[in-house]
């Protein structure tokens, strides 16, 4: 199955221009809050009408402004999980799921499908409970069961973990990951959390202010985000201004030190990205060695954060050091840090 999206929609402050494709592999839409991710899902589902463009699912046109095609939501085969799950509060778990089976006229078939979903989503003991009597994870499973009842051809999850307490997220995320991996169709996950996107989706689309900055394999995007915004969205803490020297070298501003890169440096390169875990202490003569002075440190349960500066104090970088145990002491501040050429990412504006 495949999804093709190429639409425009005028929003407050910017124009959404979403152009991407997705196949049978779970795909994340990663971006900051308000960048147009959720609106894109609503346009695909038929809840919101784009100003122009085209949406196709498995070769079937869902929306085409030029041909004046705009299928209603019921005919699109799209299942959309809202952030708040949108369960009917006065209906039981079983009744909520049956609402997703209204198109099935045969009562016995409806009951059989409902029973199948109750078993699959481990909701059988909760069938007669109301949403207010459920945990956040149970509410989510109920909402997913209702969506899956109609056998959608595309499954779209809008920030599915935002309403969950942190201690529940890991368990629920594992369940959602299994669901996405086993879903026989196109699956989209909207998130602003880079870790969720990386763990759950082998494919990714990065959006900023309504524009698609980068799309492709998730690992490829993390390794080479290409733009400063995409690098920040994927969690890169060190965005260091530079000038291009040649096809594989730059000079860092603040250090006046040349760095060698494995990736080609484009003509428009204005910065490099180096992830905080990719720095290692080194000697002054090591390749890509940067002289640093420790400014501050902070401790997390499983790593240390050190903020270092250039010798003149004008530029800063983050260095993350994993802890071997909970009580590992702070690392000794180094005089030099370096990063391998393969770990340095050329970035443009």
Task: Tell what function each PLM region has.
Residues 5-26, 32, 38-39, 46-49, ...:
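Non-catalytic connector elements of ABC transporters
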Residues 222-245, 273:
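C-terminal boundary and immediately downstream tail of ABC-type ATPase nucleotide-binding domains
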Residues 42-43, 203:
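The short alpha-helix immediately C-terminal to the Walker A/P-loop
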Residues 47, 78, 82-88, 193:
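Catalytic "switch" loops of ABC-type ATPases
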Residues 54-76:
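ABC ATPase NBD Q-loop/coupling interface
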Residues 38-41, 141-142:
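ABC ATPase nucleotide-binding domain helices that frame the ATP-binding cleft
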Residues 77, 92-229:
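ABC ATPase nucleotide-binding domains
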Residues 48-49, 56, 102, 181:
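A position-specific signal in ABC ATPase nucleotide-binding domains
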